[in-house]
Amino acid sequence: MASASSVSLMLLVAAAMASAASAQLSATFYDTSCPNALSTIKSAVTAAVNSEPRMGASLVRLHFHDCFVQGCDASVLLSGQEQNAGPNAGSLRGFNVVDNIKTQVEAICSQTVSCADILAVAARDSVVALGGPSWTVLLGRRDSTTANESQANTDLPAPSSSLAELIGNFSRKGLDVTDMVALSGAHTIGQAQCQNFRDRLYNETNIDSSFATALKANCPRPTGSGDSNLAPLDTTTPNAFDSAYYTNLLSNKGLLHSDQVLFNGGSTDNTVRNFSSNTAAFNSAFTVAMVKMGNISPLTGTQGQIRLNCSKVN
């Protein structure tokens, strides 16, 4: 058995390696090799979101679900595997938009810009397109040659998660409680399927009664009936990236159980109150958290590859 000191040393080395990998990311990574990459991505994302506002949330979710499973390496884009995991099957979308972006970028810079970086930039540009804050995306990630379905099933937070489970999920990825509450604010856009909030509608008491009644019309009690019917995560301004998500929580109008637990007499109540009344504070915390999330275990240097097609390895 390893001694305590050797275990500590191994942890320090692992932390140093992770830090070094993140340090290799740079905002200017493509300035010389593909100077028009970012503007090309932005134009494609803006067009996609203008055509279908919901796509903005879908692209943000793709980046989140990528980073939480073996790091921000575009593993979520590989056909099958992670896409078949419980949290992803039948709900992940936006692959066609990513493929379109990749095709456009390949046309100007062959095998230069990674799919992982496209996801990171597309998430930022989606938030901006819906009126949210911007931030500097660090670049230089490379694409994985593997995906991990089992890790997707264990590491992605579930809509039924308790506050303690959410804190643990995010902590294991190097994200603190404020990061977790801020990143949850991405639910100010997007929609969820009835099967993910049915139990909350019919079995929980910390939900506004009129809010629940309105939702029940499109989400019947019997399991299997209307499972894929959609409802906006933020019923107030569903297509605007703002702080209304937190204001809704103050009124017990969180759609998912994992939303409302952020304001239910627990340790995150004050953060929710602050973000609800101070949009600037939310925007600041959100951008910081997105940069931190984008730095989770990236492949850099000669690790991985630059995929020619985001859905399969070269």
Curated annotation (Swiss-Prot):
Location (main, coarse):
secreted
Compartment(s) where it occurs, according to its Swiss-Prot or TrEMBL record: Secreted
Site Transition state stabilizer — annotated at R61
Q: Which domain of life is it from?
A: Eukaryota
Q: Would you list which residues are glycosylated?
A: N148, N169, N203, N274, N309
Pyrrolidone carboxylic acid: modified positions: Q24
Q: Which SUPFAM superfamilies match?
A: Heme-dependent peroxidases (SSF48113)
Q: Name one GO cellular component term.
A: extracellular region
Q: Which positions are annotated as binding substrate?
A: P157
In the UniProt record, does the keyword Transmembrane helix occur?
Answer: no
InterPro entries, sorted: Haem_peroxidase, Haem_peroxidase_sf, Peroxidase_pln, Peroxidases_AS, Peroxidases_heam-ligand_BS, Secretory_peroxidase
State the active site: H65 (proton acceptor)
As given in the record, the signal peptide range reads 1-23
The residues that hold Ca(2+) 2 are: T188, D234, T237, D242
Cystine connections: C34-C109, C67-C72, C115-C310, C194-C219
What is the official name of this protein in its record?
Answer: Peroxidase 2
Give the originating organism: Oryza sativa subsp. indica
- Top-level taxonomy: Eukaryota, Viridiplantae, Streptophyta, Embryophyta, Tracheophyta
